[in-house]
A protein has these predicted regions:
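A conserved short beta-strand
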Residues: 107-119
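Short beta-strand/loop motif that positions the catalytic acidic residue
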Residues: 138-141, 145
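Gly/Ala-rich beta-loop-alpha elbow adjacent to hydrolase catalytic centers
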Residues: 89-93, 97
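Flexible "cap/lid" loop of the alpha/beta hydrolase fold
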Residues: 45-51, 117-137
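Active-site glycine-rich loops that stabilize anionic/oxyanionic intermediates
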Residues: 11-14, 118, 143
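C-terminal catalytic histidine-bearing segment of alpha/beta-hydrolase fold enzymes
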Residues: 151-157, 161-197
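Short beta-strand immediately N-terminal to the catalytic nucleophile in serine-hydrolase-like folds
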Residues: 87-89, 115
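Serine-hydrolase catalytic machinery in alpha/beta-hydrolase-like enzymes
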Residues: 3-82
C-alpha cells in the first residue's frame, strides 16, 4: 500500500494542537499526519493566523495580507515531508491549502480537503488549474456560516468544477464549523484520495 502525509491547516486563531485530533481521525490508513502552525500571532483573539486583515472578509486582500499569504505558503511547504500529500484545512487553513496548487508542491498533492473556506486568490487559482492534472477535492460548508458566507464559499468549489476537477460537496445547515455528522463522508473522500495513488 502506498502511503503519504495528510497535512491539515488550522483556521484563524487556531493552533496545530487544536487541529491535530480532527486530522488524526481523518487520516487514511497508514498515512502520517502533520498540522503545521501559522506563525502570525493574532493580536486580539489569541491563537495564530496565516494572514491578518482588518477589513471585510469578502473584500480582496491588501498587499501586506497578500504577502503574508505567500510567506505562509512557503512556511507550510518547508514542513511537508517527501512523498504524496493530501492537504486541507479549515477556514484560512483551507485557503492556504488551495493556494498551494500554485506552487511546486502541486506535483505531490493527490487531493484537497476544503472546510469552511474560500479562495483568497481566485484569479490565480483559476489561471493555474487548466495546466494541472485534476485530482479529487472534498468541500464542506455550512449554509449558516456568517464568517465565510455560503455564496462566497461556493465560488471556491465552482472554480474547481469549471476546470473539470471532481468535487464532493458536503453542505450542511450549520455555521462556521466542521459538521461532525458528515465526518464519515469526509473520511471516505480522503481515503479515496489516498487509494488513487
Amino acid at each position: 500500500m502506498n502511503t503519504g502525509t495528510l497535512v491539515m491547516l488550522h483556521g484563524m486563531t487556531g493552533t496545530s494542537e487544536k487541529m491535530q485530533s480532527l486530522a488524526d481521525s481523518l487520516a487514511p490508513s497508514g498515512w502520517k499526519v502533520i498540522c503545521p502552525q501559522a506563525e502570525i500571532e493574532h493580536p486580539t483573539r489569541g491563537g495564530y493566523a496565516w494572514w491578518l486583515r482588518a477589513e471585510d472578509p469578502t473584500l480582496p486582500l491588501r498587499k501586506e495580507s497578500q504577502q503574508q499569504v505567500l510567506d505562509s505558503m512557503q512556511r507550510v511547504i518547508r514542513d511537508i515531508p517527501d512523498g504524496p500529500v493530501i492537504i486541507g484545512g479549515f477556514s484560512q487553513g483551507g485557503a492556504i491549502a488551495s493556494a498551494l496548487l500554485e506552487t511546486e508542491l502541486h506535483e505531490r498533492i493527490v487531493g484537497l480537503v476544503l472546510i469552511g473556506t474560500k479562495t483568497v486568490r481566485p484569479d490565480k487559482l483559476a489561471e493555474s488549474l487548466p495546466f494541472l492534472k485534476p485530482r479529487e477535492i472534498v468541500w464542506m460548508h455550512g449554509r449558516r456560516d456568517h464568517l465565510v458566507t455560503f455564496e462566497v464559499a461556493i465560488e471556491h468549489a465552482e472554480i474547481f468544477e469549471s476546470a473539470g476537477w471532481p468535487v464532493t460537496r458536503l453542505e450542511h445547515e450549520k455555521g462556521h464549523m466542521v459538521n461532525l455528522n458528515q465526518l464519515d463522508e469526509l473520511k471516505s473522500s480522503i481515503q479515496r484520495m489516498a487509494n488513487s495513488i
